[in-house]
Amino acid sequence: MTQTEIIITVAACLIVLAQGIFLFIDAKKRNHMAWVWGIVGLIQAPMPLICYYFFVIRPDRKKRGIKQ
C-alpha cells in the first residue's frame, strides 16, 4: 500500500466510526433502537446518516413541533 492509500483508509475508518458513534448516541437520546443505528452506521457512509435523518430526526422534530 502506498502512503496515500493508507491515509485514505484511515480517514474512511475514522469517518465511519464517528458516524456510528453519533448515530448510537443520538438514537439513544431519542429512544430509537440505538444499537441498530450504531451498527448500521459502522457499515458505510453517508447513507445511514441520511436514512437516520429522514426516519428518525425529521419525524421527531415534526412530533415536537420544531421547525427547521
UniProtKB/Swiss-Prot annotation:
Tree of life domain = Bacteria
Q: In this entry, which stretches build a coiled coil?
A: none
> Where in or outside the cell is it found?
Cell membrane
Q: List the disulfide bonds.
A: none
GO cellular component terms, semicolon-separated: plasma membrane
Has keyword Zinc?
Answer: no
Bilayer-crossing regions? 5-25, 37-57
Q: How does it sit in the membrane?
A: Multi-pass membrane protein
> Key word Lipid biosynthesis present in the record?
no
Q: What induces the gene encoding this protein?
A: Expression is sigma Y-dependent. Induced upon nitrogen starvation.
Swiss-Prot/TrEMBL keywords: Cell membrane, Membrane, Transmembrane, Transmembrane helix
Q: What does this protein do?
A: Together with YxlE, is important for negative regulation of sigma Y activity, being the major negative regulator.
Name assigned to this protein: Negative regulatory protein YxlD
